[in-house]
Regions:
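A short glycine-threonine-serine/GTX helix/turn-capping micro-motif
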Residues: 2-12
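ATP-dependent carboxylate-amine ligase
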Residues: 22-30, 36, 40-46, 50-188
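Short, conserved micro-motifs enriched in small and acidic residues
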Residues: 10-15, 65
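Internal glycine-rich flexible loops
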Residues: 6, 17, 31-32, 38
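Glycine-rich phosphate/diphosphate-binding loops and the adjacent beta-loop-alpha structural elements
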Residues: 6-8, 18-26
Length: 188
C-alpha cells in the first residue's frame, strides 16, 4: 500500500489536515513518526463531526462554528445540498461573506432562536426555504422532513450562544441527542 493510500484510510479527513500530512512527506519526515502521530490523533468533537445517517441523509455536528468564517468553511467542504440549522443572535452579525456560499450550497435554513430577524433578513434572497424552530428538537425534526436522499443536515450556529452560560459542547450535545431521538423513531 502506498503512503497516500495509507493516508486516505487514516482518521484524517479534513483537507487542511491532509495537506499537513502530505507536507510531512515532502519534507521527508519519517513515515513511522507520521503513522504514530496519525494513530494518536483524535478527532475534536463538534467540528464538522459526523453523527449518523438516517434514510440516506447524513447529520453533522458543527457546534464549534460560532462565527461566520467557521460556518463558511463547513459549507465550502461539501458538494451535497445542505439543510442548515443556525442560531439567531441579538448581535449585529455581518453574514455578507457567507451569502454566496449559502446560495450555492444551502437548500434550507432552520433558525433556532427567538432572535432570528437579522439571520432571516440576511439570507432571504439567498435561501428559498427558511423556517423557525422553537428548540433543537423541533429544528432537527423539521430538518429531517425537509432533507431528501443525499442531503446533509448541519448544525453550524454561526454565532455564540445567546444563553450566557451555554457552551458549544452543550449545544452540540443537544443536537446529537435530538438526532438520536429521530433515529430511534425511524428504527421503530
Amino acid at each position: 500500500m502506498t503512503y497516500f493510500e495509507e493516508l486516505s484510510n487514516s482518521r484524517i479527513k479534513h483537507a487542511e489536515n491532509m495537506a499537513s500530512a502530505i507536507s510531512s512527506k515532502v519534507l521527508q519526515i519519517r513515515k513511522e513518526n507520521i503513522k504514530q502521530s496519525l494513530s494518536d490523533y483524535g478527532i475534536l468533537g463538534h467540528r464538522k463531526e459526523y453523527v449518523t445517517t438516517i434514510d440516506e441523509v447524513m447529520y453533522f455536528d458543527d457546534a464549534k462554528a460560532e462565527n461566520v468564517n467557521a460556518t463558511w468553511f463547513t459549507f465550502e467542504s461539501t458538494t451535497k445540498p445542505i439543510v442548515w440549522i443556525a442560531c439567531g443572535s441579538n448581535e449585529n452579525i455581518d453574514y455578507t461573506d457567507l451569502l454566496l456560499m449559502a446560495k450555492q450550497n444551502v437548500k434550507a435554513l432552520i433558525c433556532l432562536s427567538d432572535k432570528n430577524g437579522n439571520l432571516k433578513n440576511a439570507f432571504e434572497n439567498s435561501i428559498h426555504e427558511i423556517y423557525d424552530a422553537k428548540d433543537m428538537d423541533e429544528a432537527v425534526r423539521m430538518a429531517s422532513i425537509v432533507a431528501q436522499d443525499d442531503d446533509i443536515v448541519v448544525f453550524s450556529p454561526a454565532c455564540k450562544s445567546a444563553k450566557q452560560n451555554e457552551t458549544f459542547e452543550e449545544r452540540g450535545n443537544q443536537f446529537r441527542n435530538s438526532v438520536k431521538q429521530i433515529e430511534n423513531e425511524w428504527h421503530q
